[in-house]
């Protein structure tokens, strides 16, 4: 490049010298092993960078969260739109969590006119308490002697009995007079003045009190004992069986064909089982069988005919 004048040539040379000077200094710093630090840079002169370094006794987490490790974009306030969006979401989520937690109702950040503050007031729920108030115990006087202790228990029993009687009396007064009419399980009592009057219903307590008022030792008082129980009917003795008359026994004589002693044994065995027979006699030689007992001739004949041939003895006339 050719210059038109000497002045322009000198100006060009001076500018080249100025540009070469910082390059030489930078090359010198590069040779020394680092970049030159500009002490007048506003980032270096920031107040947060001038804070003293953390002491070695602090936790490593606090040292890691110090401003020395803060990104450059955050320190310059040049956060990206994505980071701002995430921060807004976190803040909204934190607000919703704070609204749900019971501790947030009592936070000082809630204004006094808001509904959240009014709902968090514990006095708001005083009207909805449905439990009975706890009675305050009354200090009873100390009892030292045994007599005082007995008197104290008697007084308490009298008070309890009076309360019970008052409640029962008030209950009966509220009911109608014929409330217990269907529950009466006793008979009506006649009036003592007029025994022929209509029977009037009286309570058992009233009849008992009327008996107590009368003097048992007075001659007018008559006590009627309960009637004796009716006599039991005499036990009837069982009828005695009729005595057997010996004259009622009948004698039956039969002619039986007996061939041997075996035939006689069969007849004897059969007669022993016959009902009503008291005695019998077998004459083997004459072939004669005599039966005595409460039997009829036809019954004996029919029974023996089952074993052997038999017929009535000719001398006996059938009755």
Swiss-Prot record:
From the UniProt record, list the coiled-coil ranges.
none
Region of interest: Disordered: 1-113, 191-248
Q: Name one Pfam family in it.
A: HMA
- GO molecular function list: metal ion binding
What GO cellular-component annotations does this UniProt entry give? Answer: cytoplasm; endoplasmic reticulum; nucleus
InterPro entries named in the record: HMA_dom (IPR006121), HMA_dom_sf (IPR036163), NAKR1-3 (IPR044526)
Its protein name is Protein SODIUM POTASSIUM ROOT DEFECTIVE 1
Organism, scientific name: Arabidopsis thaliana (Mouse-ear cress)
Going by the UniProt record, its keywords in alphabetical order are:
Cytoplasm, Endoplasmic reticulum, Metal-binding, Nucleus, Zinc
A single GO BP: flower development
**Which ranges carry the HMA domain?**
249-315
Where is it mainly found? cytoplasm
Superkingdom per UniProt: Eukaryota
Tissue and organ expression note:
Expressed in vascular tissues of cotyledons, rosette leaves and roots in developing seedlings before and during the floral transition. Expressed specifically in the phloem companion cells. Not detected in embryos or seeds. Not detected in the vegetative shoot apex.
The record lists the effect of residue 263 to G as:
Loss of metal binding
- Description of how the protein assembles with itself and partners: Interacts with FT, but not with TSF (TWIN SISTER OF FT).
Does the record carry Zinc as a key word? Answer: yes
Q: What does this protein do?
A: Required for root meristem maintenance after germination. Involved in phloem translocation, starch accumulation and flowering. Promotes flowering in the photoperiod pathway. Regulates long-distance movement of FT from leaves to the shoot apex through the phloem stream.
Compositional bias segments (type: Pro residues): 224-242
Q: Give the Low complexity compositional bias ranges.
A: 14-27, 58-67
Ranges of compositional bias, category Basic and acidic residues:
36-49
Induction is noted as: Circadian-regulation. Up-regulated by CO in leaves in response to long days.
**Keyword Endoplasmic reticulum carried by entry:** yes
Compositional bias of kind Polar residues = 1-13, 104-113, 200-210
